[in-house]
């Protein structure tokens, strides 16, 4: 297996899983920050503007500037350049950018039920369950919009998008 992508719901232990995966395989980690930095270098668009493409809400000026579309195009280019190398773990939103026509990619999704994620978020951030649930709802909306924009699919955790869907709360 040359490339492993890991996409995760928030508070599903993605960082720990990816860290262990990289340590065990010796593969190079490519993060969203790496892809954003490369896309910024390729395009001349500042990193914070490119990073906004991961948010469900586009800029109010997007109709005029097409900033979201330009940022996404450069992120796709950065991902395409990254996958030329072998033995990669691509974690985060960027893993969804790897072409579906590449057959040596293992696509993994990490997810847990909302109750477990809320409890983990509340403990980690020292906030109420209600505040944690609001944060998770917002982050899930961002992930759902990302998957909708790329694949016209409404469920970011849909099994047909991945080779493996692993529950992290079991």
Question: Where do the protein language model's features map onto the residues?
Answer:
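Short loop/helix-cap segments at secondary-structure boundaries that form the rim of catalytic
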Residues: 97-103, 157-159
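ATP-dependent small-molecule kinase phosphotransfer cores
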Residues: 34-87, 94
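Residue-level preference for the first positions of well-ordered beta-strands
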Residues: 3-5, 87-89
